A protein has these predicted regions:
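Beta1-alpha1 glycine-rich phosphate/pyrophosphate-binding loop at the start
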Residues: 1-72
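FAD-binding core/adjacent interface of flavoenzyme oxidoreductases
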Residues: 71-128
């Protein structure tokens, strides 16, 4: 059985997953997707929260809602990738072997790197 591992269950990772699942034979492929967060944040919707058009509930959903049946979803941080041995080591010590690897980990918000960003309006206004 061939093993596909996708790192990152954000927009890119789940789009790849949902495009590949219908075309890969489940008898021949084992698919695992890994993400450190259980929640998906629909970031374009953040713009509309301060104007009352969306609420947090509208833009924050469980990532499991976007994972097709039969796919193994692991909620864990990634420790390292050994590309020569085709292994992904997770923070909890789990090792995932793969034949194919898709890296779609996206970006992380680091507000403290921008002076003034962590002020009193952080996560209460458009900066959320």
């Amino acid at each position: 059985m061939k093993k596909l591992v996708i790192l990152g269950a954000g927009t890119a990772g789940t789009m790849m997953l949902n495009k590949l699942v219908p075309v890969l034979n489940s008898d021949e492929w084992s698919i695992t997707i890994v993400d450190q967060s259980e929640k998906h944040y629909y970031q374009p919707g953040f713009l509309f929260i301060p104007f009352g058009m969306y609420t947090k509930k509208d833009v924050i959903k469980p990532k499991a809602n976007f994972i097709p049946f039969g796919v193994n979803f692991i909620n864990s941080k990634i420790d390292k990738i050994d590309g020569e041995k085709n292994k992904v080591m997770l923070e909890d010590g789990v090792v995932l072997n793969y034949d194919y690897l898709i890296i779609a980990t996206g970006v992380g918000i680091v507000p403290d790197e921008t002076p003034g960003m962590l002020g009193p309006q952080w996560q209460d206004s458009i900066h959320e």
